[in-house]
């Protein structure tokens, strides 16, 4: 088959073409078609999406793919010639520092090629090096960083780089290494010339020549060249004390040689590149083309190559520092792809290690060389002074990490000799730079040669032996090291003394700083390093705790002098502020800005956890002229109805009314008491701006605005500015002397107004009770015009006033318990509503804890606080008054029981006198339509009912239940739990009856319907008449039956559960029919027997109904009934009881019952001679 052109091949890939046009089937051209379509699709796509997809895709590993799967024929054809053969090829990982590169290597007999595998299985050439310029070595750890397998790796390099080559297996590694060493040696034999002159420049070496020219062979390594250079320069020493550097025009920075490289190959590679550029691109340059290889100085700067000899300690620092300037390609992280902007030089020029020391005058130099006459350099003294001054008040000093960029910039400034103002730097940055300085001291400040001796110190017996050994080891150190250690451990000891505030104990400090003070001389296993690190930490901890015994007692005075000298050197014109980059709060760091401020002693006394943001004592408008600190208590939580930007002026009231002084107070911790200034009243030392400030109360501080502490005494010229910006400080309101005098004058008025408020509240209660009763009567009268059906609306609820209290009321319900009506928004009079609104602001909110004002020094708040102390501690007041309340409650129960007994006796007497004048009539019970609603009662007995609510009777204490009425009890009630009410209007329900009926002999002062439970009465109940008979009871017999009933009810309640269905059936099957009797005691005996039978059959749930079965179901009677006589007799008793009730106000059960103490109904009668009667009974707990 004929070969197709690329255009025909592309056409064959199109789906619409037939096989006749392409000359081949689609199936045959399938794989190639997919491959080319993928390439075209990638070209059409936008560059960002293609880069993102490639970055997110899994990068194929060259180790997993076999070389046979990649077509290498086309790639190798460009290198193959008659004299070149391929020895081996395969995947490898090249590592340089922290960079990893996956490459595919090709080894020819005279050439080494490194290529990168592309996604379409093609190769891209990365390096092509002659074997004569290459070298190999086994120093893996000196080239690469991190975990490396030495069994699978070796060092492979060429001018002027070194890589760690890692292969798939040790066998592959050995095979590659042997082939490289063999053919490198063979190619070096072909070099011409065998030797070349090499100029060596000496730098940082005193008393020697500037440079020397030596002759090197093509097989000489860098270590051998160093030995020859030392002899030529007349320098005594070992080759380990010096290092050879290469300054190539190809690289931006000098490159250090480890020792196994070939300087001959490095220089010849530069000459060959020059020859290739001048003579043309040829595979190699013949020796004839290099007739003048010694005229390197005549070449351009970028083609030159110089070798520099430096001492090892400076060379080590230069190696790590210049690596930051050395350009090398760095793979971008896909995580930061959104920040790829502009040039990539800031990524490609990053140092290999961010903590690498910078060469110069300070870092990487031994202390004896830095210290002149055993005096520390000024930058080191400044840092120690700053840490000694600010470190004790800084939380997490030496532990909190700092910004690496700030650390690097500060190190560069210090290393270059530039004067640095440490006040402008973060204390965490200074602490980090100091640790970096310790890490860069050659062989550590404790000397790595004495490492084993230092580690064994903690294995000794007692502290005296340890101190003696430590002092002997210190004598072996250079004098400059000991001087620095004295200052350093003095600072650490001072920080440890304030560990309660900075949370840095001796152990925490030792853990943070021990790795920078001492480390082992050589690398060891991780297990041994961890064990040694622990021992070194214990040693440093012991030194911090016993530094005065080790270094002498004068170390404390040394630190004091140091702090004073540092304060004198720092002039007050330095006004630089820099926000701390640490994670700690900025306010806490602002408190640490000036340790010599008058409040420093106050801040130092703070304990752990007492410097939280909500407990910082704010200091505003600090007066430089006053010797004492003026602290203003933060006033917050003003009237929430006012906006934040609105000013609230204080004006004298025009008329006597409660004065609302909005004072926000909260629970004061012990730490805040310690912060409170101990000076006299603060009003005497307020500045002028603060004296004028009380004219207008300040707005609330926003949550985003920090509290500003003006503790810096050096910012005197900013005082006027910050006085204008006083609203941004945390002092939200300031009161002046005028306000203090005014508050003292209004205090007696407030006391009198409170008494008036209580009286008006009582008066408002009576008015609200009348309004409530009248409104209920009106609503009930409206419902009487609907015929025989009486509908009770759910909204028209009687408002009871009960004295029963729920003893477990929470403090949150306390303000609501002091209300006097059930619905204050609807029934309260205007003056009571205003009083409640004014007092509502003064109540402590539920979220605010109670406080006890012990250390408040503001004299103008004492009177206000003493008046509000009982409200702030309402929970404690309830607990103290609980016993007194129980005693008063019991006494009221006894009095209420007596009144009930008296009223019952009086009712019985009235019944006896009127029983002879009444006749029995048939009454048709009305069809009631009762909506289910909660019952109301004046006899609240939480102890007797399961739900805490009591049983009430709205119209009468006793009523008759019809034979066909459905009565569904919902809860068990007490047989005595009943309520007496007066008669209602005669006209309200007169249309519901065929003829008026009068019953006599009932033991109660009023007639009504008993609704002791929630009941559902059917509308469609068949109306049938029932025989009603008049019964006369003797008082003693009635009371005896009541006591027996009460005992039976209390016993049966505990043993027998209420069964609503059974009681319902009993009420249907057993209508209440009592025989008619004339008069006298037999009726009482028969009534007592019938009551006992009812109690035994129906249980306690129906006992109350048995008492009420003798009354007419109609709740409305004529005004001329004999019960008005009983009401007239009870009036004096009720008036007397009302006086007792008004004298003792008690909290209520809940917010709905808390506004009433007894059920009170005002009724109008048709009789002109009868006047409206107010009848109240107090419920008791029996």
UniProtKB/Swiss-Prot annotation:
Gene Ontology process terms (BP): regulation of Rho protein signal transduction; signal transduction
Pfam families, A to Z: RA, RHG20_PH, RhoGAP
Domain Rho-GAP: 365-551
SUPFAM superfamilies linked to this entry: GTPase activation domain, GAP, PH domain-like, Ubiquitin-like
Record region (Disordered): 1-40, 745-772, 803-839, 935-955, 982-1011, 1074-1101, 1142-1182
Domain Ras-associating: 194-283
InterPro entries listed in its UniProt record: ARHGAP20-like_RhoGAP, ARHGAP20_PH, ARHGAP20_RA, PH-like_dom_sf, PH_domain, RA_dom, Rho_GTPase_activation_prot, RhoGAP_dom
Alphabetically ordered keywords of this record: GTPase activation, Phosphoprotein
Keyword Phosphoprotein in record: yes
Segments of skewed composition (Basic and acidic residues): 811-824
Name of the protein in question: Rho GTPase-activating protein 20
Taxonomy of the source species: Eukaryota, Metazoa, Chordata, Craniata, Vertebrata
